[in-house]
């Protein structure tokens, strides 16, 4: 190494001919490089932080979406189950109500006219369980719960022979008597021209009228 060149370690430069020369360019370049590295690192770090922040919210949003989808699916299943139960409950209630109405209608009720217990349930009026139709066998009357008493002829529901009047009875007896007392008469072989005694009373022989 040259004798006239001495390094000045304390000042960071070298001594030339009794003068200390500082390494300004080198120091400035290194400082600039160091500053540039720091700035670049500072620039890179925020970008990485932003990317990490973006990744974290993206992961959070994906997790939230998955949880929201699961909650929606659970709600749909609950609604379906609840809807099925709600749809099945009214049907069961209707069946129970109809069964109770039929059981109540099947019980014999006293007739509102004659108070007889000899009654029977016929059917539901207008297919309504609240209007059971009953029939009284004693007075032959139909009535509906909550309705008016229906008048039915006494002979309804029974097939009977029609009663005969006095003229019909007389005509019937006359036919029976004629059938019992009618006798065929034949002429006597000795007198072929002589009429039968049966016809003699009905058609008497006279001179004006030949036989």
Curated annotation (Swiss-Prot):
Q: Which InterPro entries match?
A: Dof (IPR045174), Znf_Dof (IPR003851)
Q: Where does Zn(2+) bind?
A: 111, 114, 136, 139
* GO CC terms of this entry: nucleus
* Zinc finger (Dof-type) stretch: 109-163
Metal-binding as UniProt keyword = yes
PROSITE patterns tied to this protein: ZF_DOF_1 (PS01361), ZF_DOF_2 (PS50884)
Comp. bias intervals (Basic and acidic residues): 68-80
Tree of life domain: Eukaryota
The protein, known as: Dof zinc finger protein 5
Question: What gene does this protein come from?
Answer: DOF5
């Amino acid at each position: 190494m040259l004798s006239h060149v001495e390094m000045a370690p304390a000042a960071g430069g070298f001594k030339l001919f009794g003068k200390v020369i500082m390494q300004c360019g080198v120091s400035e370049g290194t400082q600039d490089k160091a500053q540039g590295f720091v700035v670049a690192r500072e620039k890179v770090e925020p970008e990485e932080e932003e990317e990490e922040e973006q990744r974290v919210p993206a992961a959070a949003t994906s997790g939230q979406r998955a949880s929201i989808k699961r909650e929606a699916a659970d709600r749909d299943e609950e609604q379906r189950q609840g809807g099925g139960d709600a749809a099945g409950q009214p049907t069961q209630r209707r069946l129970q109500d109809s069964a109770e109405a039929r059981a109540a209608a099947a019980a014999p009720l006293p007739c509102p006219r004659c108070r007889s217990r000899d009654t029977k349930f016929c059917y539901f009026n207008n297919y309504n369980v609240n209007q059971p139709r009953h029939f009284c066998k004693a007075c032959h009357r139909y009535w509906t719960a909550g309705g008016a008493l229906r008048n039915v002829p006494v002979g309804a529901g029974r097939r009977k022979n029609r009663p005969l009047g006095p003229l019909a009875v007389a005509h019937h007896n006359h036919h029976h008597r004629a059938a019992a007392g009618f006798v065929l008469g034949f002429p006597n072989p000795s007198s072929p021209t002589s009429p039968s005694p049966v016809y003699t009373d009905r058609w008497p022989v006279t001179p004006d009228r030949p036989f």
